[in-house]
Amino acid sequence: MPPKLDPSQIVDVYVRVTGGEVGAASSLAPKIGPLGLAPKKIGEDIAKETAKEWKGLRVTVKLTVQNRQAKVTVVPSAAALVIKALKEPERDRKKVKNIKHNGNISFDDVIEIAKIMRPRSIAKELSGTVKEILGTCVSVGCTVDGKDPKDLQEEINSGDIDIPNE
């Protein structure tokens, strides 16, 4: 038998969910059951927390559990932030699979997303984080200021575009 959990201990649990949907309680149970929490209630809390801003998007949710209380925090991925910046109408996830987004976001949006992602980035400088976000834009399939994100990455590398540090 595994050792009993100390209730005052703080435990972080990360779960991938679709915003605004109550995930299957069975997928939450093995992660939060041993912590003494009801998976169904936590599923509803997550759905309520993600319904407003992240409806229909896949986001990671951080559950901070202490004294049998769970605090829900949304930890969005770069792709989720880019798709949110596109401001596209929500699609039915079950009907439309592997969506290619063909919108356009401004370079200022990319810099804002890079500032949000900065603590989790591997890059040394903000310009490196901006290039990471531009790479995500390529994967999502959107353009930045009407240009291909790869061209913008080359302009940053050659020094044509200057990115402020922080």
UniProtKB/Swiss-Prot annotation:
GO terms for cellular component: cytosolic large ribosomal subunit; plastid. InterPro entries: Ribosomal_uL11 (IPR000911), Ribosomal_uL11_C (IPR020783), Ribosomal_uL11_C_sf (IPR036769), Ribosomal_uL11_CS (IPR020785), Ribosomal_uL11_N (IPR020784), Ribosomal_uL11_N_sf (IPR036796). Keywords: Ribonucleoprotein, Ribosomal protein, RNA-binding, rRNA-binding. The keyword Transcription does not apply. The keyword S-adenosyl-L-methionine does not apply. One of its GO terms (biological process) is translation. Gene3D superfamilies: Ribosomal protein L11, C-terminal domain, Ribosomal protein L11/L12, N-terminal domain. One of its GO terms (molecular function) is mRNA binding. Binds directly to 26S ribosomal RNA. Belongs to the universal ribosomal protein uL11 family. This is Large ribosomal subunit protein uL11x. The gene is RPL12C.
